[in-house]
């Protein structure tokens, strides 16, 4: 629906956790399932990463990993990036801003965000958040959610989720403005075949 209005090369993508894989694929990365299978042999207890045993499960058979040339920058938060070595990341030629918590117990920082920051062909801006866990990037919980989902809602002592989110918003705005240029009103793409209305 929004595709015809996207300015080519001016699209910024934000990916969190497994969404980081999606953002990387859209920006030119090629999934390498052999890497995931090898990782799961080394760390079989990582149930979240290895529950499919290195098999890529698509919602529909026609879905295939494909880059989108309109993507001009990516912001990744606690990205799951086990699928990508240097060769698989060679096609990612856009600026990247990466955040991860140094106390992430769900997505191993050393094999994901940290390794990704070393391997991307365009050196990213990599920021490690002291004391933060995997779920610090999720919305602040209300009282009921804190009781029902404590693992998702409780942060370590000294970690202020609201403050982190405010910082992320400011830093993301600066990053995307620098990477993509100042925001401009998007017009319907001529490639969509729809005529543009003339202003009078």
Predicted segments — roles?
Residues 33-55, 66-79:
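A conserved short beta-strand
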Residues 143-200:
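Catalytic active-site module of serine/aspartate enzymes centered on a nucleophile-bearing elbow/loop
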């Amino acid at each position: 629906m929004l595709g015809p209005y996207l300015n080519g090369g001016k699209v910024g993508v934000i990916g969190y956790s497994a969404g980081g894989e999606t953002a990387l694929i859209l920006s030119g990365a090629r999934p390498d399932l052999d890497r995931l299978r090898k990782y799961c042999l080394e760390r079989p207890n990582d149930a979240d990463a290895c529950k499919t045993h290195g098999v890529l499960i698509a919602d529909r058979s026609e879905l295939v990993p494909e880059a989108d040339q309109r993507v001009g920058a990516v912001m990744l938060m606690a990205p799951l990036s086990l699928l990508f070595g240097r060769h698989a990341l060679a096609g990612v030629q856009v600026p990247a801003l990466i955040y991860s918590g140094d106390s992430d117990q769900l997505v191993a920082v050393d094999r994901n965000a940290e390794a990704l920051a070393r391997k991307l062909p365009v050196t990213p801006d990599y920021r490690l958040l002291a004391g933060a866990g995997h779920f610090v990037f999720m919305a602040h919980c209300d009282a009921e959610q804190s009781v029902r989902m404590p693992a998702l809602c409780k942060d370590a002592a000294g970690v202020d989720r609201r403050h982190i989110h405010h910082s992320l918003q400011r830093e993301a705005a600066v990053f995307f403005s620098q990477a993509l240029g100042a925001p401009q009103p998007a017009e319907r793409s001529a490639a969509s075949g729809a005529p543009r209305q003339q202003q009078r």
